[in-house]
């Protein structure tokens, strides 16, 4: 998960959270709290101030109000550069990496960067010096020169980004820091990869798109679930036509995080839990949205055009606190307004439907749903099962293992990859570094990052407007109509 002091009892195939150093709660406002406060949760970056912050007792907005605000935000600003769709990396024999954020996620991902051939970790950054130094020790233990350590406060990442000997900056910090860090990296000439979600506001998403186009630097949402074995197999099968014409899909982040969010040692500070006091919508859509968007070639022949969201009451976190937390715990000052479960329906330009769910507050088994349906059959994950005509005609699910021949070449060549989450983390890092070394087009880009993250603010607004369908911006500015490469890549010649 984002920031921890000890390993978590997580399922092997559980997706990661972004995260690294977060200062413990204190009386004086941190840069993180100032960033969020001055940004204005009430607006979520799309002029929502009049609609309220999401307080459970606040009046709901009207559909016309919500539609007006979302339409204004969906309108593409004047382009400042040229499209980054289909733009290749420069190509280098060695990729020089700087890592910002060395908590639970960043502290484990550094092992994978070190395991990939042709990668050198040149710099590490975390305001908690002990974490930064532990990461630096991993670099030297791997036989690389000692990296420069940046640990002089929350702004020291800016000095890392200014270095002239970095090609790529990896960001794994609390969510509210993702946008300023990605922005700083690109302004200093670095390609940047950010853990989920890449930003929390629509205006920030547009800024990242414009910066990527203007600076000619790639800005990527590092969505590891796109590289899961099942996800990549379904992707290849979908593109080969085994599901027929695609109709619908579903993805989710349904993962009971109550124990971890209230654990004083797992995250450094309550930043993850505090998001449930700010927004009512889907805080973490990327793990479910990314793979299904790939199946449907979103931004590569289709696009996500609208979203409608509803949410349950916010009950479970307060109930958990009542049962588990002692009187006087800082959490008793918090008012939770984030829906226990949000359900969103995304419609594409071709009329397809994608269902997204988010629930980290109530008791349930882990699931990303990961389903895809078409005119010839359907796949559903958790547990994995498939039904395809003409093979299946008895109304009984079939064994997905029978379709192993459709595994992506990455999984055929790396059958037992190192790292967590069933190997998808390593696959993502390996493939990204390979694209950078060989001068290939990245599997996903800033337009995918913005599209997969747009449900964060838009679901909040739609829920406030009682489920009103709202437009999703076309971050590609029309480029989505063109067929281009994506995660379903061919094996390159080394």
UniProtKB/Swiss-Prot annotation:
Residues spanning the signal sequence: 1-58
InterPro entries named in the record: Gfo/Idh/MocA-like_OxRdtase_N, Gfo/Idh/MocA_oxidrdct_glycsds, Glyco_hydro_109_C, NAD(P)-bd_dom_sf, TAT_signal
Keyword Hydrolase: yes
UniProt keyword list: Glycosidase, Hydrolase, NAD, Signal
Source superkingdom: Bacteria
Free-text comment on the cofactor: Binds 1 NAD(+) per subunit. The NAD(+) cannot dissociate.
Enzyme class, broadest EC rank: hydrolase
Cofactor(s) named in the record: NAD(+)
Modification after translation, per record: Predicted to be exported by the Tat system. The position of the signal peptide cleavage has not been experimentally proven.
Chain positions covered by the region annotation Disordered: 1-32
GO MF, one example: hydrolase activity, acting on glycosyl bonds
Residues the record lists as binding substrate: 253, 272, 284-287, 366
EC id: 3.2.1.-
One Pfam entry name: GFO_IDH_MocA
Positions of NAD(+) binding: 104-105, 126, 175-178, 195-196, 224, 284
Keyword Flavoprotein (UniProt): no
PROSITE patterns the UniProt entry points to: TAT
Described purpose of this protein according to its UniProt entry: Glycosidase.
Protein family membership: Belongs to the Gfo/Idh/MocA family. Glycosyl hydrolase 109 subfamily.
PANTHER family, A to Z: BCDNA.GH03377, GLYCOSYL HYDROLASE FAMILY 109 PROTEIN
The protein, known as: Glycosyl hydrolase family 109 protein
């Amino acid at each position: 998960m984002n920031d921890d002091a000890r390993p978590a009892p997580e399922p092997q195939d559980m997706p990661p959270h972004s995260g690294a150093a977060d200062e413990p709660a204190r009386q004086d406002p941190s840069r993180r709290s100032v960033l969020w406060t001055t940004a204005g949760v009430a607006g979520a970056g799309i002029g929502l101030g009049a609609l309220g912050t999401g307080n459970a007792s606040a009046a709901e907005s009207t559909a016309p109000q919500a539609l007006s605000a979302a339409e204004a935000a969906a309108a593409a600003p004047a382009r400042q550069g040229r499209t980054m769709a289909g733009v290749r990396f420069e190509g280098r024999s060695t990729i020089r990496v700087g890592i910002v954020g060395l908590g639970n996620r960043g502290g484990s991902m550094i092992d994978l960067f070190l395991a990939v051939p042709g990668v050198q970790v040149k710099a590490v950054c975390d305001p908690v010096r002990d974490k930064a130094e532990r990461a630096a020790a991993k670099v030297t233990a791997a036989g690389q020169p000692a990296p420069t350590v940046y640990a002089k406060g929350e702004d020291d990442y800016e000095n890392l980004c200014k270095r002239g000997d970095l090609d790529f900056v990896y960001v794994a910090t609390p969510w509210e820091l993702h946008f300023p860090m990605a922005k700083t990296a690109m302004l200093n000439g670095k390609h940047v990869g950010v853990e989920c979600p890449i930003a929390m506001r629509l205006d920030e998403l547009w800024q990242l798109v414009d910066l990527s186009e203007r600076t000619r630097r790639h800005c990527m949402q590092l969505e590891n679930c796109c590289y899961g074995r099942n996800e990549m197999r379904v992707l290849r099968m979908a593109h080969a036509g085994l599901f027929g014409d695609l109709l619908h899909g579903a993805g989710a982040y349904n993962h009971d995080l109550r124990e971890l969010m209230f654990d004083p040692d797992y995250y450094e500070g309550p930043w993850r839990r505090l998001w449930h006091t700010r927004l009512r919508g889907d805080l973490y859509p990327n793990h479910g949205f990314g793979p299904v968007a790939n199946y449907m070639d979103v931004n590569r022949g289709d696009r996500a055009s609208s979203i409608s969201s509803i949410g349950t009451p916010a009950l479970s976190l307060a109930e958990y606190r009542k049962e588990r937390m002692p009187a006087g715990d800082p959490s008793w000052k918090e008012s939770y307004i984030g829906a226990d479960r949000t359900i969103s329906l995304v419609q594409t330009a071709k009329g397809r439907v994608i269902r997204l769910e988010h629930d980290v507050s109530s008791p349930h088994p882990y699931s990303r749903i990961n389903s895809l349906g078409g005119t010839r059959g359907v796949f559903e994950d958790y547990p994995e099962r498939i039904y395809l005509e003409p093979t299946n005609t008895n109304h009984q699910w079939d064994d997905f293992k029978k379709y192993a021949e459709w595994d992506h070449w990455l999984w055929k060549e790396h059958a037992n990859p190192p790292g967590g989450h069933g190997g998808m983390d390593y696959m993502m890092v390996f493939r990204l570094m390979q694209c950078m070394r060989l001068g290939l087009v990245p599997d996903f880009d800033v337009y995918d990052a913005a599209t997969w993250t747009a449900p964060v603010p838009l679901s909040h607004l739609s829920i406030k407007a009682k489920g009103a369908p709202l437009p999703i911006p076309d971050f590609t500015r029309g480029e989505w109509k063109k067929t281009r490469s994506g995660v379903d890549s061919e094996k390159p010649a080394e």
